[in-house]
Amino acid sequence: MWSPIPGTLMRTSSLPAVIEASGNDDWKKRKEAQSLKRLEVKKKRIERRNSLACNTSKEAAGQSPKEMNANTDKLVSSDETIVSANESHSSGKHLVKGLPPKYQATITSEDSSSAMRKKPNSAFKGTAITEEQNSSSSVPSSGEAISSVTAPSLPLLSLVPITATLGSREDQSILGRAGARANGMGDVERRMMQEMPGVFTKGLSNGSRVEGFLYKYSKGEVRIVCICHGSFLTPSEFVEHAGAGKVDNPLRHIVVSATPNL
């Protein structure tokens, strides 16, 4: 027979409460350990990024001042050598402060010694201030000025005549090319005038005169370029173009001029 279902289900068996509590504790511990590991990994990544960024910034910030200091030291040393050379050149008359003038040096070798002659350039750039010497103690002697110019400063001064000679060579080459081009144009015009002499009409009934150039003159063909229109004409057409009409011998009325028609 069918029996009705009871309203509530009764639990027949279950795990002890101690076992369930211990399982929950283990699961919580595992989750905490995983979260701690993740946090440690994140911290390590952040520390690496920060350390790399700090190293790169330190290197960039450390190299640029060194390079700037090296460049400034080089500039100061070169300025000091040039100022000392300027003082020796002035022979105790003037004391120059500020930027030194440009020099053009020429090197001549005799036996095994070389002498340098320095000439100040007319275009003086900079803010140079000259002051009269009040006492002889303020101006160094010639021996001190010569000793102040060290061996590394000599190549800097030796570069000046090289650039000056290069500039003069370039100017000479440009002038030479321009002159050759002008001479070439003159030769071309002269040759064209020799190959294409000027002609004009003469002795026509109407007395008109038309000028032109003899473009082609060979045994079988003669062509004349009219100046007024620039058209290529035969001798008979050239005479007709002058307004004389048809003539028996047109070459008798065409004269070759000795001077070119310009």
Swiss-Prot record:
Record-linked Pfam families: NLS_NINJA_AFP, TDBD
Name of the protein described by the UniProt record: Ninja-family protein 2
Any single biological process term in GO: signal transduction
Localization: Nucleus
Keyword Ion transport assigned: no
Chief location: nucleus
Location of region: Disordered: 49-70
InterPro entries the UniProt entry points to: Ninja_fam, NLS_NINJA_AFP-like, TDBD
